[in-house]
Amino acid sequence: MAAVAARAGGLLWLRAAGAERRRCGLRCAALVQGFLQPGGEDTAQKRRVAHFTFHPDPESLQYGQTQKMNLFQSITSALDNSLAKDPTAVIFGEDVAFGGVFRCTVGLRDKYGKDRVFNTPLCEQGIVGFGIGIAVTGATAIAEIQFADYIFPAFDQIVNEAAKYRYRSGDLFNCGSLTIRAPWGCVGHGALYHSQSPEAFFAHCPGIKVVIPRSPFQAKGLLLSCIEDKNPCIFFEPKILYRAAVEQVPVEPYKIPLSQAEVIQEGSDVTLVAWGTQVHVIREVASMAQEKLGVSCEVIDLRTIVPWDVDTVCKSVIKTGRLLISHEAPLTGGFASEISSTVQEECFLNLEAPISRVCGYDTPFPHIFEPFYIPDKWKCYDALRKMINY
């Protein structure tokens, strides 16, 4: 069914794809930067991950045998599990047939065939629209947008079609089996068009879920939950962690519940909230605060941005009386604003200091000035110290 729908929709799509090839020059630029060169990401990431140290999760034995994987390998494992379990599942996007820019789909075309893992034109709107059509037939559509920065041409398809399909049909039809994957966040050399964190744009859109993992173990479990969820999901993958993050990951499929934040370190004085790569930054901040100030920090990984876990965050703030939220995206209109607003409504009388947001600047993402742009541990530590002294 999925293959028939793919071929039928593909014929119409290919006729209109010519105007969408605007990124050929950018692809060449990406080659020069090292995105597509074998090992290119390794060199860049080893050179530029000084703003954080990856903290692996403790090995979990409850899901059976584990294997050492980096983040992109855990993504591959999740996709492999999905294709093996669900004969209707298909994976498609730019260059996914040869393994993708970051190698997340490597080997899957050879294993499952060209009708289930295939390339698309350079047309994000078409990729997502195509995925909606696949999902409406009842098949499982796993679409890849090559970089989160290029998801915006597909904004109309995501916001006005995928998110509203079930609602506008009175639940007669839905495209809930659509999952959109996209590499996300800073990478050390991505500059304006390969570094953005656009989660807040989609947080304002009822009908979709937005998920961002912090580690290989989390990535596999959360991605499998997204793929099997009954709602369209956007799964943003921190690309700086593709190779920098390595830990033991179960070989067999397992799921981590969506919309459940995780308290990864308990504390009593300050609540620190982040997601994706920034979780590792605030974990370092928590250690610095304990060592230098004697301050006990509770660290929360939000994991699901929409719908987010209000109860876990508010319960923590009621205990600590202070909240610091950090993300790479710009400050104004960032998702930290939504968390801050909700917490002050729910926990106002418990707050001991103003809520602090430590985020990217309200500028385009810079290239050589990336180290000054990102909300590193020193910026977070300074903000925490101000809260303590308030």
Swiss-Prot record:
Cofactor: thiamine diphosphate
Main location as per UniProt: mitochondrion
Keyword Cell cycle: no
Superkingdom per UniProt: Eukaryota
Cited Gene3D superfamilies: 3.40.50.920, 3.40.50.970
Modified residues (N6-acetyllysine): K230, K239
Catalytic activity: N(6)-[(R)-lipoyl]-L-lysyl-[protein] + 3-methyl-2-oxobutanoate + H(+) = N(6)-[(R)-S(8)-2-methylpropanoyldihydrolipoyl]-L-lysyl-[protein] + CO2
Protein purpose: Together with BCKDHA forms the heterotetrameric E1 subunit of the mitochondrial branched-chain alpha-ketoacid dehydrogenase (BCKD) complex. The BCKD complex catalyzes the multi-step oxidative decarboxylation of alpha-ketoacids derived from the branched-chain amino-acids valine, leucine and isoleucine producing CO2 and acyl-CoA which is subsequently utilized to produce energy. The E1 subunit catalyzes the first step with the decarboxylation of the alpha-ketoacid forming an enzyme-product intermediate.
Name under which the protein is recorded: 2-oxoisovalerate dehydrogenase subunit beta, mitochondrial
The organism of origin for this protein: Mus musculus
Name of the gene: Bckdhb
